[in-house]
Amino acid sequence: MPKTPVLMDHDGAVDDYLAALLLLTMDHVEPLGIIVTPADCYIQPAVSITRKMLDLIGRSTVPVAESTVRGINPFPQLYRRDSLVIDCFPILNEQDEIKTPLLPESGQDFMVRVLREAIEPVTLLITGPLTTLAVALDAAPDIEAKIQQLVWMGGALNVRGNVAIDLEPGQDGSAEWNAYWDAEAIDRVWQTQIPIVMCPLDITNNVPVTPGFIRKLAKQRRYPLSDLAGQCYSLVIPQDYYFWDVLATAYLGQPEFFQLREWETAIVTKGRSQGRTKLEAGGRKIQALDSVDIDRFYAYILQQWAK
């Protein structure tokens, strides 16, 4: 059975690495590479973590590229510093050298090259802002035809966003962070005909990382993937934390767990609501993950990380 070609673009937060770990456990997926966008991270440790992680799981042939794009509204340093901590985890630093290659070209140029060279249309899995894709589309509009679908963790349709007003007083609380980082990039992608599957806060708010899940993960820490995932989640125990990027990635592995719903949408690019993914009659049609079989999802993640 032919494998599904997938190019991943993540932005270096805790759940981005775990989403990559999940993707690479999927036997039906052919990973074409991983791009790291400098958003919810410090880019050098985020790239380092990605490469060390690939070494850990024996996938050092998967190339990594560093995007050099910039957003409009930076993530708080409080969020981004997790990348500095994870890069020092002992489990990622047993070896003296990193084998996984870091490509000399930028992430946006790598995206263009991969799509142009692809024999069949490629699925893009993006778990951060869409800026790298937007820049790639501006540089090479022809790549749009090579994209099978975009699976994106981002946006909030019928719920409030997660940009806290105390951290961003210029925002009204309606935006989700991946959209708020660069609303103009989201709007650029919305102008295309690329089929979009959103994993918005509407569904992720219902899928928390629970103490019960953490306990089950701890009981299988003899597996390197579970050990690394457990250490990553230990960084976020004091806060409410959800399966954002991991949930979006799980859709590629087990789409039958999910119900999708079509919405007509538009992107607010200016003012206090910038980054809002709003419903608008006659707007851009997208598919959104609407509900998930939570018990089957939790069981699937534990199964995939028992390696």
Predicted regions and their residues:
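Conformational coupling and interaction surfaces
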Residues: 1-3, 19-31, 177-180, 184, ...
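Active-site histidine-anchored catalytic micro-motif
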Residues: 2-51, 96-198, 204
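Short, mixed-charge aromatic SLiMs
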Residues: 41-45, 73, 156-160, 266-282
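Short, surface-exposed amphipathic charged segments that create phosphate/polyanion-binding patches used
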Residues: 78-84, 164-167, 214-215
